[in-house]
């Protein structure tokens, strides 16, 4: 019999209304977190100096246990499972728009409503941005499982499987109750403790013992790994579940695998021998419509290779258009026993499974496959690993979760695509056992490689603990951004495609095609104005994927789609895509991306001022960091073409482009008129980069032409926009023209990242750049929300946020990280960390938006666009820090390991053009 402690007698769990096992362990103490102090306490300094303690603050205040878990690292995002976030925000909606801004967007709103109705009710499709059905606040998410491009499954910090992206780019935010871990402890042949390791109290599977006491458990995330520590009160047992996903920089094989591993370290701190088992239950599908078609079935499997045996269950889910097989598996060792239950009803009481475990801590392991389900019927299975545990000892129980969806179709269902991992495992849909076996045999090597990559940052005592968490945990989006990584068959690239791009075919065929969404709510692949910020993570960690993406973007640039459509903001009818301009995005996963680009329907982005410039800047940055001369030569004609397209925006021939009097750049609801700090700065930076590329490509006439433009443009930029403290937002007569834009130095940011922007290659006067950054810090950061929420996009000189648009008074997390990188580049290191810290603490510690970092939030009440691409720009901070550590005469280059090495013997610095001479 199992001993149950009534809720009224439980320590720290008095409010719960079901039986759970939370006996007082006696002498428990709360986790103490050393106070590192505030940067304000010590004042500005040249280098940050922070202590290396746990940085969990209030997130661990509810923890009543004393267990620290087995080999849980000191750095990361740590939260007690009983924690409740006090602040409950809501997504941005129309009623959050001021009356003046509502009037400005009335036409757009009416056109959007008409388009939304046709899309949802006539076409039966989901809008690429659904402004009427934003994702609600759910403060539950943790590290996703799965490598890059094979789909992801997110496990929440309380242990729930709650966010699914198996169909490419399409998300289902649904907690599946049957997907659980169960622990069973036996002493002297009797089960003394059996508990679902979940805080849930569901109305299904009611025979199971739910309602784990969260006060004795905590979660710790350091992506791509996570740890959950459970102290089992009264049992002298601590469980540490380590979740491992193969996110491996510079690896283009294992990083693509759709797998995750759960390693359970069970510590027996008592004086009695224990029999312990962990059971992993999993539903076939997600329930509801996902199961409605029926014909789902499970079967056991056993695979022995190379002296290692893995066994478990296959959950076959043949529903079109993207059928898949899920595998729940465990490693068999001399010290463990693996058993299973092939099928049970996830909507029933669960009594059969529960009683089976109670009897002997194992499952009955029936042979053969289950009967296929009827329409609407659910099915689940479970795998159990058990072992004997001596007093004062530890055992290790290993599970894997793999899913095999080799062939995919996007929403248009017009083409079949093969995921990257099929190159290594095959595409017949029968490799889930092999994936499971591979994961369980290789995860230790993955962890060694992850540690070798992360440790230089984690061991750096000059870096604050919050930054170490942010840098790695924000990388979740590279896998969980609706990401696809596809094979590119040879016959899909016609001979004439790409013209003179000699490396295009080999790059795409060797490294595949990569796509990630602008955001989980903004469903467009490779949104380029945002990738400008996020791309630092990709080029530093998987540079070949960045180059592949750039080749795809170059191909799309050279094409046109003259299909005419009405744009929602202006109401103007214009083509989908014009030749020789960078597309906004590569397409919608609910359509046919790469075939039909520019899913973005709000503006005609052919007239945007930033896209072409961002392409040129990224091409040079990617060349600079990779040293790939062939890539630069391939992209040079495309850069010439897009810059030629950009020339028409310099209407007065003063060397500086003008914005068009509407929101014609990444701030797509913030009107810009005439020469502007943001687009003008990007323009000058792109022109400067064209001068450098012309030298490298031996195009002297082009070099002279752009050098002349740069000379005139620099003078116009300073004359029209510099006011002595910062660069004006734009040069119009509008009241907001003197706003302080936090992103005004974006051009300088990229120049510095490319080893330019100072000395002979100076474009913006260094004193002006530093003064502008100081002004931004004083007003956009320190004068906004007490300096604790990052930098507001726009601020009036008298210290009031610019509310002239719906975006000017927002904080954009990815922009703030880029701003912080710029500050670090210019020697304002303390200010940079202080600025970025406000965003991290707001998102991860205050708002409860871990692993769903939004594009934006306001000072109060709202956030916008959860799980967004742009915050990957935090890797620009890391690049700036690493570049700081290198001598001026050396060039950073992406290599195996942490991201950069110095190779002074090669690279573009051999032939830099002097930008300060005619």
Swiss-Prot record:
GO molecular function, one term: beta-glucosidase activity
EC numbers, comma separated: 3.2.1.45, 2.4.1.-, 3.2.1.-, 3.2.1.46
Membrane topology: Peripheral membrane protein
Phenotype on disruption: Homozygous knockout mice display an accumulation of glucosylceramides in testis, brain and liver. The accumulation of glucosylceramides in Sertoli cells alters sperm shape and males exhibit impaired fertility. Despite the bile acid glucosidase and transferase activities measured in vitro, bile acid metabolism is normal in knockout mice. No obvious neurological symptoms, organomegaly or lifespan alteration are observed. Cholesterol metabolism and protein glycosylation are also normal in these mice.
GO biological process, one term: glucosylceramide catabolic process
Effect of pH on activity: Optimum pH is between 6.0 and 7.0.
Highest taxon listed in the record's lineage: Eukaryota
Compartments in which it is found: Endoplasmic reticulum membrane; Golgi apparatus membrane
GO cellular component: cytosol; endoplasmic reticulum membrane; Golgi membrane
Regulation: Enzymatic activity is dependent on membrane association and requires the presence of lipids. Inhibited by N-(adamantanemethyloxypentyl)-deoxynojirimycin/AMP-DNM. Inhibited by its product sphingosine/N-acylsphing-4-enine in a feedback loop. Also inhibited by other non-acetylated sphingoid bases and their derivatives but not by sphingosine-1-phosphate and complex sphingolipids.
Gene3D superfamilies: 1.50.10.10
Pathway: Lipid metabolism; sphingolipid metabolism; Steroid metabolism; cholesterol metabolism
Tissues expressed in: Widely expressed at low level. Highly expressed in testis and brain. Ubiquitously expressed in the brain (at protein level). Expressed by Sertoli cells (at protein level).
Keywords: Cholesterol metabolism, Endoplasmic reticulum, Glycosidase, Glycosyltransferase, Golgi apparatus, Hydrolase, Lipid metabolism, Membrane, Phosphoprotein, Sphingolipid metabolism, Steroid metabolism, Sterol metabolism, Transferase
Residue ranges that the Swiss-Prot or TrEMBL entry lists as coiled coil: none
Modification type Phosphoserine: residues: 893
Compositionally biased residues, Polar residues: 892-904
Residue ranges of the region described as Disordered: 886-918
Protein family (similarity comment): Belongs to the non-lysosomal glucosylceramidase family.
Protein role: Non-lysosomal glucosylceramidase that catalyzes the hydrolysis of glucosylceramides/GlcCers (such as beta-D-glucosyl-(1<->1')-N-acylsphing-4-enine) to free glucose and ceramides (such as N-acylsphing-4-enine). GlcCers are membrane glycosphingolipids that have a wide intracellular distribution. They are the main precursors of more complex glycosphingolipids that play a role in cellular growth, differentiation, adhesion, signaling, cytoskeletal dynamics and membrane properties.
Protein name, as recorded: Non-lysosomal glucosylceramidase
